[in-house]
């Protein structure tokens, strides 16, 4: 899934998550740079593109206490004429089982504490609360209107 709505709903319900580090699910991990402790922003992702490459990023970031991220170890690319490429991430099954065990070993109280921390982070610093989402939507619409450039007109001709 591109954004990970089910995992976002899970965190908002104060349930910890296990996610593949891919697409929008990266945003739900609360990744921070180890170098300065700052949360990755949309501008950071615009510069780097993605944290997909575990070789480059796994040791350079930390994550929120509500998530156990699982990094893709293999990526395949397929495609067709209508969809030129689709990148498919493959995780290491033993690593997934370790993540499940991690949450199991945390116990009920540990999972509840982590879930509450996740919901709090989503509503505040990560910005998934309704007020921030409305502001981002309004800002995006304003930016689209401000930067709109009409396409050059063209004529259609009927050939006999």
What are the language-model segments listed below?
Residues 1-2, 17, 23-24, 75, ...:
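Short, solvent-exposed loop/turn segments at secondary-structure junctions
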Residues 20-21, 27, 45, 49, ...:
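Conserved acidic donor-binding loop of glycosyltransferase catalytic domains
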């Amino acid at each position: 899934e591109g954004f990970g709505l089910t995992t976002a709903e899970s965190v908002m319900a104060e349930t910890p998550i296990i996610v593949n580090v891919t697409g929008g699910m990266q945003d739900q991990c609360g990744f921070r740079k180890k170098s300065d402790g700052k949360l990755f922003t949309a501008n950071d992702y615009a510069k780097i593109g993605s944290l997909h490459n575990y070789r480059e990023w796994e040791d350079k970031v930390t994550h929120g206490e509500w998530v156990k991220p699982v990094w893709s170890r293999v990526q395949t690319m397929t495609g067709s004429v209508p969809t030129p490429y689709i990148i498919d991430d493959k995780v290491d099954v033993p690593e997934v089982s370790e993540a499940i065990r991690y949450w199991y070993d945390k116990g009920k109280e540990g999972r509840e504490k982590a879930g509450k921390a996740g919901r709090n982070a989503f509503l505040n610093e990560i910005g998934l609360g309704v007020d921030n989402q409305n502001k981002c939507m309004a800002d995006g619409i304003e930016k689209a209107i401000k930067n709109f450039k009409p396409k050059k007109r063209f004529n259609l001709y009927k050939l006999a």
